[in-house]
């Protein structure tokens, strides 16, 4: 994943460490008055990112982050999800469709059925197929746990 497109942005100093992953939630009213707003808002709202490089140790004043912000390079981070086994082929490009999951799920399985940062119809690449998950309510449905890159 080293050849992925990087984006330069600002992030709170507490998160400005290589390998840290986060979801970008968009701007706040405090951002309106900031001269660096356009750099911060270069990310896509609701998407998951990973810090791949801290550019320098220059601390920038930030109205949102109490300890300031730093310049970092980020890439979109993979998302773990459940996928119909017929679509779970490593390297394939798909349009994500959330599977029909049992109503009574444990928290981990629920998060895989309805992953944050991924919308139905969104294009993504299946990076890795990690195993089979069977739904108790309907044994005919076979799902695979996969790593997807939107």
UniProtKB/Swiss-Prot annotation:
Belongs to the UPF0179 family. This is UPF0179 protein Mbur_1033. It holds the Pfam family UPF0179. It comes from Methanococcoides burtonii (strain DSM 6242 / NBRC 107633 / OCM 468 / ACE-M). InterPro entries: UPF0179.
């Amino acid at each position: 994943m080293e050849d992925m497109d990087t984006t330069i942005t600002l992030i709170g100093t507490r998160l400005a460490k290589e390998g840290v992953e986060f979801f970008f939630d968009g701007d706040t009213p405090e951002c309106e008055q900031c001269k660096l707003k356009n750099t911060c808002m270069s990310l896509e709202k609701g998407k998951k990112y990973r810090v791949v490089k801290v550019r320098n140790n220059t601390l920038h004043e930030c109205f949102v982050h109490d300890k300031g912000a730093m310049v970092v390079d980020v890439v979109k981070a993979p998302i773990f999800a459940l996928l119909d086994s017929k679509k779970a082929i490593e390297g394939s490009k798909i349009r994500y469709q959330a599977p029909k999951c049992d109503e009574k799920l444990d928290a981990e399985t629920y998060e895989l059925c309805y992953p944050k940062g991924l919308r139905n119809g969104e294009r993504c690449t299946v990076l890795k197929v990690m195993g089979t998950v069977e739904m108790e309510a309907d044994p005919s449905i076979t799902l695979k746990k996969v790593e997807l890159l939107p």
